[in-house]
Amino acid sequence: MSGISPLTKGKQRGIQVMMGIRLAILAISFLAASTPAGHAESPAVRNCTWCHGTGAQGYTPAPRLAGQRSQYLESQLAGFRSHARDNPFSKQYMWGAAASLSAQSAHELAIYFSALPSRPAGDGDTELVATGRTIYQQGMPEDNIVACVVCHGPNAEGVGQIPRLGGLAYSYLQRTLEQWGQGYHLNSGAPMPDIASKLSPDQIAALASYLSFIK
């Protein structure tokens, strides 16, 4: 039989993505300072879609940006530039990509992406949704873990610099909770490292599943 195997196609796709990332970093470096960022046709927006997908709906391992809170997006871009957001994916991809963004460009990008329509990933385990909902809404008093709803809102919509979690991809939510528990972002001053470190893998899976379905 002839043709390209799925494995080879996957490797080729990976190479294409990495090349795109490198080109994006170069383009941002040369263009971000002189081009309005908050526009659908701006180089900065187009570069973001290399990893975050068309319409910024997310593309593994990059999260959905569409509909995310602008204050959160802006603070995270600042965290990438200062290296405060220090997990492996941030170091590999976003430290370089955000390095040359001005504060104004970061603000414009955050406003632009926050205004885009979003759709829930809906890719979690439906059998875990009920358990995840209970953890989100009630917390785990026996482990001194406050309910997620207290900070992230009844529909996981977030507030201010607290992110919207509703509808994000299962894999992103799971990985982020695991990284919080592993001690990343300790210098952010956020309570999540302590909270996530008390969650078991099964509890993380349940939470991520529940959140992935929220519209």
Residue positions per predicted region:
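Positively charged n-region of N-terminal signal peptides that target proteins for export
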Residues: 2, 18-22
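Bacterial N-terminal signal peptides
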Residues: 22-33
